[in-house]
Amino acid sequence: MGQQLFATNSLGGYLTNNQLSQQVRYLAQTMQRFRQFCDPEPAAGTNRGNKVLFNKISNISTAGGTLVETDTIPKRNYTITQGSLTMTEYGNSIPFTQKVKTLADIQVPETIRTVLMNDMKVVLDSAAATQFKTNDYIATITNTATTTFGSAGAALATAGANMSDKNVRDIVDRMKTLLIPKREDDNYSCVASTNSIRGLYDFFEAKAQLTTLGPLYRGEVGQYYGCRFVEETNFLSNTDGSDGLYGEAVFFGADAVREGIAIPEEIRVGIPADFGRDQGIAWYALLGFQQVWDYSTDGQTRIIVVDSL
């Protein structure tokens, strides 16, 4: 047996160098799907203040009708309610030293940019999702044959199942009776957690049919009963209900949530301090999201949230 050994540094181990792989691996990211459904607010922008006001007009106070020849035409009115969208600063940063940048075997700024981009996408999509989910009209999947609805901002029952085709029909039909307008493709949309739609895949139309409808949404998994379904894993819970096994979902039509942008999200490189030794990279945005219709004040909604006590 030889006397020079790899296992002992002084006898051979010092003759080798470990190598660092140049392939950097990152943690898997959530699927962020809500922001693509926000409508841009053209009144927002730079030098226009941090808030956009928007008016909502009611129907006429009393409907018109037939007239007697000698009567005057009745005089009615409508009411105006006003909503607002507030833009807020968002951001995060990672500082680093010139020394680590200079001596590292991989590109420190590039890894920082990737980590910040991932954070930026999660944060902004969650901000958009909050506006979709903060809603007065709630549907609870009591079981696969029964859907319980509440309109005061809280679920009225505990979920006992994930959505079935029957529950979807209940929700879509309720959206129609609530006069929720369909989106520009003449369909409703649903962003759903993984558990909430696991029972629907047998009912989705063939994907080949979907391609004839135009571009698919990011994360779109199927269509059923006039509603297009998108799966997300960033914001909605998969642990609702009595057994903690059931998922949340959000159904919506047109004009649900608006997005106002003064400064779109961007990566910024900080000005070095301490004679170049103190450096940093950040992401920053000045923008905001706002649900348009509030059932408690407007008497209408554009969103139904699937949730549970």
Q: Where do the model's predicted regions map?
A:
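Sequence/fold signature of self-assembling virion shell proteins
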Residues: 2-37, 81, 150-174, 199-309
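Assembly/oligomerization interface modules of large self-assembling protein complexes
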Residues: 30-92
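Hydrophobic alpha-helical segments involved in membrane association or supramolecular assembly
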Residues: 54, 114, 118, 187-190, ...
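Flexible glycine-/small-residue-rich
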Residues: 56, 192-194, 231
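Beta-strand elements of well-folded, non-transmembrane domains
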Residues: 58, 98, 285-289
